[in-house]
Every structure is written in structure tokens, then in C-alpha cells.
Amino acid sequence: MRSILRPFLIATLFIGCLATAATAQSFEGVLEFTKTTGPVVTSYKYYVKGERIRIEEISARGEVQGIMLVDTRDKTVTAISPERKLYMDVPNMRLPKDVETTVQKTSDMKDMAGYKCEKWVVKSGPEDRVLTYWVAADAFDFFVPLLETLNRKDEQAVFFLEIKDNKGVFPMLGIEQKSDGAEVSRLEVKKVTKGAQKPSLFEIPAGFNKFERN
């Protein structure tokens, strides 16, 4: 009986190890990117560790202007002002935006930020928008839950959530255009660094006070 069961036990253990390894391989590290809207260029950094993400907005001088701590498990967002040493909870009261779109996943490939990226195109006639994403697959499991937690109304986020089977990828380049081809905004990853992140990055710094609305 033992000899009969042994192969099944070994197979079960092997499958369990594979599942654990797959979970453990979720991306952890830093993504640095820019957002261009007209003449305005803003730099950002995403620090990622499991279900927690730290978003930093970087000034032209390289200084951190603002921070958001996002917990995709608890669906919470905390805004931090380094200059004023204040933090506040960001309520999520906005209803998800409903848009009518068509999605095309092409076979076009491009090398970007050290990744082979595939071209995905999302169009909406009623919204007068065409979104082109060049996506990389590297167990970026945090990204869709991040967009859902932030619940932003900008088209770069809204249109990406319209794509089926969008889990585990990250757009190394996202271009928003009007139907006539005029560019509205551009998100472009400049650098991806894998590596363990300190838990303290995702905590409110000591000595910071909570901002209370009157």
C-alpha cells in the first residue's frame, strides 16, 4: 500500500512546491517611470513588496515631493507629505468608470527596459481615445490590484482594466491618443530593479502627524 501511495505523495509534494515557488516569484523591486502630459513631465517610483506599494513623486531636482502607501489587500491608500511631516487616509468614494472599448492583443514585440514587450491596443469611439500598451510579463501581480485600489479616472488606468487576462503584466510604455492620433499622455518605464525591499518603506515614518479635515 505504501509503495502504491508513494508516487502520489511525491507528486502532491512536487505540485505544492511548484505552487509555493510561483507565489514566491511575484515581482519585488523598484520601477522608475515618467508621465508626460503635454509639456509637463513628472517622474515616479514604485516600490513593490507583496501586496504593498510605495509610490513616490520625484521633483526635477530629484527630491521626493509626495508619497502614497497602498495596501491592495486592505484596499487602503495613505498620502504622505515629507515636507510637512503629515499623512492622511485617502478615501475611495469614486464609482468605477464604465467605458465601451475594443481590445486587440497583437504579436508585435519590442525590447524595452530589459524586457520583451507585446503590443496591446484598446480603442473607444465614444471616449475618442486609443490606448497603446507595450506590456512585459514578469509576475507583476501587484499592478491590477493597485489600479483597482487607486480607482483612478484617467484613461491610462481605466482602459488597462478593460483588458481580459491582464494579470501579471506591466506596461513598460503606455501611450494615450485621440482618435486622430494626437498624443494626450505617455507613461514610460526608465528602469526596473529587482530586489528585496525594506518593510519600513511601506510604513508611516515616525514623528509624522495625521492630517485631520475640519
Predicted segments with their positions:
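Absolute protein N-terminus
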Residues: 1, 24-25
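Bacterial N-terminal signal peptides that target proteins for export
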Residues: 1-12
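Sec/Tat signal peptide C-region and signal peptidase I cleavage site
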Residues: 18-24
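Extended soluble regions of mature proteins
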Residues: 25-214
